[in-house]
Amino acid sequence: MAFIQEIKRKMTTVQSTIKITNAMKMVSRAKFVRFKKQFKEVNYFFNEFYKAVGQVVLSLKKMPKPLENPKTLWVMMSSSLGLCGQHNTNMNKLLQTKFQPGDKIFFLGRKNQSFWNKGDTDNPTVGYVDIQDRDLSFDYCQQVSDQIMEQFDLHQLDRICIIYTQFKNPLIQHANSFQVFPFDVAMFKAFNPVKMEQKLDFEPDEETIIKLISPQFFDIALYGGLVETKLCESASRQNAMDAAAKNAKDLYEKYSIQFNKLRQNSITQEIIEIIGGIS
């Protein structure tokens, strides 16, 4: 009888879990719809802006040479909340393959800090901003980019790279990275695969334009990466909660079958005892 009560208690607990995971799934779904709309609105502009900047970069008379053993400031766009599947883990794994001694990390979101902050003297963290969903705007990203550039200059680093999550579809998202400063010629060639037939004239010259647009490019790249990463985070959390709800339902059915069998055996035993007493 005590075991039956224990199974019943577990069933009640699982029912509560199902309600919680379903509620979190609905919240994640609402955020996903909002961020997807925001992503669609800005993605076209970002792509066209990258192409326009690429035309200037690829028109340089003297292409910048790749840096040898550069010291990098990695901007990690992790989440501030958990229960989002492999979203944060995948970015950590990607950075592990790229991180070199002397590199530094600026965190946007708090979840991945503990993985990299080992408490020793070689702590790579140089900054942290906890960006909430309601803070995600271009103006706010401009303020954050100023903080990042301060750390970049303070630690005398060579380049800035962003670690973010690239959106494929609601079920598939990939951790990715790209260099935002100095300009990566290979990235702009990917955005401008067709060779320009007519050479463009720039006023002022290309070098001056690049110096002027570099801060704006960083602001836009930061905002675009955050919007896409937030979209991926909400999709990943929605999938995680959906899987958790399904697993909880399966567990509830298992407990329900077990409960019914035990209850049936208990009733059968009581009937046998009653019949035995009458006879």
Swiss-Prot record:
Q: CDD domains attached here?
A: F1-ATPase_gamma (cd12151)
What organism is this sequence from? Mycoplasma pneumoniae (strain ATCC 29342 / M129 / Subtype 1) (Mycoplasmoides pneumoniae)
UniProt keyword terms in alphabetical order: ATP synthesis, Cell membrane, CF(1), Hydrogen ion transport, Ion transport, Membrane, Transport
Specify one Pfam family.
ATP-synt
Gene Ontology CC, one term:
proton-transporting ATP synthase complex
Subunit comment: F-type ATPases have 2 components, CF(1) - the catalytic core - and CF(0) - the membrane proton channel. CF(1) has five subunits: alpha(3), beta(3), gamma(1), delta(1), epsilon(1). CF(0) has three main subunits: a, b and c.
Keyword Ribosomal protein listed? The answer is no
Q: What does this protein do?
A: Produces ATP from ADP in the presence of a proton gradient across the membrane. The gamma chain is believed to be important in regulating ATPase activity and the flow of protons through the CF(0) complex.
Q: Cite the SUPFAM superfamilies for this sequence.
A: ATP synthase (F1-ATPase), gamma subunit
Q: From the Swiss-Prot or TrEMBL record, give the protein name.
A: ATP synthase gamma chain
UniProt record similarity statement = Belongs to the ATPase gamma chain family.
Topology in the lipid bilayer is annotated as:
Peripheral membrane protein
UniProt-listed Gene3D superfamilies: 3.40.1380.10, ATP synthase, gamma subunit, helix hairpin domain
One GO MF annotation is: ATP binding
Task: Give the chief site where it resides.
Answer: membrane
UniProt subcellular location = Cell membrane
Which GO biological process annotations does it have? proton motive force-driven plasma membrane ATP synthesis
Which InterPro entries does the annotation name? ATP_synth_F1_ATPase_gsu (IPR035968), ATP_synth_F1_gsu (IPR000131)
